[in-house]
Regions:
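Catalytic binding pocket for nucleotide-activated donors in carbohydrate/polymer assembly enzymes
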Residues: 28-122, 136-138
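Sequence-pattern detector for short linear motifs
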Residues: 6, 54, 122, 150-153
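Conserved catalytic-core segment of nucleotide-activated headgroup transferases in glycan assembly
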Residues: 1-25
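Low-complexity, compositionally biased segments
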Residues: 18-19, 70-71, 83-86, 140, ...
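C-terminal alpha-helical cap of glycosyltransferases
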Residues: 124-156
C-alpha cells in the first residue's frame, strides 16, 4: 500500500475518534514527534521502519504499520513492540486507531515506562550488544533478544 493510500485510510479511520493527525514539514519532524502522543512508523523501502527506532529513542509511542509481514526487532521477547506501542497491517488501520483512542491513562503511562526500559535496545550500541550476545550464545539464555525467522517470499 502506498503512503498516499495509507493517509486516506488514516483520515477515514479517525472520523469517529478524538484523535487527529498532522503531517509536518520535514525540517520540523522532531518537534512534531515530541508533541504527539502516538507517532506513525510505516514500513519503509525495506521491510521495517527506521522511524520506529527514532520514535522509541525519543520516548514516544510508535504505531508501526506493515503491508504484508510485521518485520519487527525483538519480536516474541519481553521487549517486543506490543509492550510499548501499536502495530497493524495496512488496510486494517481502523482497529489500531480504535485501540489508540480507547487506551486508558494507566495503560498509556505503562507504555511510556516500558519505552524507558527498552530505549537502549534501539540505539546503535544497543543493537551491537544484542548482536554480540546472539553470536556468543544464539540458542542459550545469554543470547539476547534477537530472533531468527525466515524471510517472507514477497520481494520488496
Amino acid at each position: 500500500m502506498s503512503r498516499s493510500k495509507m493517509l486516506v485510510e488514516i483520515e477515514a479511520s479517525l472520523d469517529d475518534t478524538s484523535l487527529k493527525y498532522k503531517i509536518g514539514p520535514s525540517a520540523e519532524w522532531l518537534q512534531y514527534i515530541h508533541k504527539s502522543k502516538f507517532n506513525l512508523a510505516p514500513r519503509g523501502f525495506g521491510r521495517t521502519s527506521y522511524r520506529l527506532a527514532e520514535i522509541v529513542q525519543i520516548g514516544r509511542i510508535p504505531v508501526y504499520m506493515y503491508d504484508d509481514f510485521p518485520w519487527l526487532p525483538y519480536a516474541g521477547t519481553e521487549i517486543d513492540l506490543s509492550n510499548f506501542g501499536f502495530s497493524g497491517q495496512m488496510g486494517s488501520l481502523r482497529k489500531v486507531v480504535t485501540e489508540m483512542n480507547t487506551i486508558s491513562p494507566e495503560k498509556f503511562q505503562k507504555m511510556i515506562q516500558s519505552l524507558a526500559v527498552v530505549r537502549k535496545h534501539y540505539t546503535y550500541s544497543g543493537v551491537i550488544n544484542q548482536i554480540e550476545m546472539f553470536i556468543r550464545d544464539p540458542l542459550g539464555l545469554d543470547g539476547g533478544h534477537l530472533r531468527c525467522c525466515r524471510v517472507p517470499d514477497k520481494e520488496h
